[in-house]
Amino acid sequence: MKMRYLAVLLLSAVLLVGCGNNTTTKSGNTEVDTTTETKQKESLADMMETKEYSCTVDDSFMYYVMYVTNNSDKVVSIDLNVTALDSSGSMVGSSSDGTKAVAPGQTAGIWTTFDEWDKIDSFDYALSVSEEKEYSPVYSDLSVDYNTTGSGIVASVTNNGTSAADYVWMDVVYLKDGKMVNFSELSFMDDNQELQPGTTLSQEGTCYSDSGFDDAVIAINGRK
């Protein structure tokens, strides 16, 4: 399964406090094809506002996307583990990935696909959050502009900083009547996976959905 960087009624949230690197974890369960939003709490993990999206594409696979907004005053590293469940609660798939150097106020994206689209009824997730020690954020250095079109989105990102930004991505969730119908991930990098200082790069994404879309929500990832 490929994982990059929401689905819905939050049934439970369990907080586990890690040791050593001050990692905190929260977990939850969400149903398919809906959207959910958590509220801020007191720990580092629970100061992350999460939105989950999921949809089936062409009776072929299912997207699962989580947007995480950092409502803390720390730069954080985020790791996500997702388990897909069938209607009886049995596990049918799992995937893990994360994102680095998420600045205060930044919304970052993590996503995956599941081949077991016809078996999935809900998702369990565990979100681990720790203060970033290895990378620096680039969020405040980036200017983002985008327009939706009849078929998708056209976007540009400018690096206003003085050093190169690494692995700059925009995740795009396309919505119709509030439900996810498709997804794009756009990269803003040269051959060295960098967005150089003073450089603007543009990309286009297409929403492949017979129903079309009436809204698009984005998340930005990057580090240095």
Model-derived segments and their meaning:
Residues 68-72, 156-161:
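Asparagine-centered strand-capping/turn motif at beta-strand->loop junctions
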Residues 71-78, 91-92, 120, 163-167, ...:
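Short acidic/proline- and small/hydrophobic-mixed sequence motifs that coincide with surface turns
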Residues 112-152, 206-224:
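Terminal connector regions
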Residues 58-65, 147-154, 201:
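Short, solvent-exposed loop/turn segments enriched in Ser/Thr/Gly
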Residues 21-63:
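N-terminal, intrinsically disordered, polar/charged segments of Gram-positive cell-envelope systems
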Residues 90-118, 183-210:
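Intrinsically disordered, low-complexity Pro/Gly/Ser/Thr-rich segments with frequent PxxP/GP/PP motifs
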Residues 48, 77, 87-96, 135-138, ...:
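Short beta-strand and strand-turn-strand segments in soluble, beta-rich domains
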Residues 15-18:
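C-terminal motif of bacterial Sec signal peptides marking the signal peptidase cleavage site
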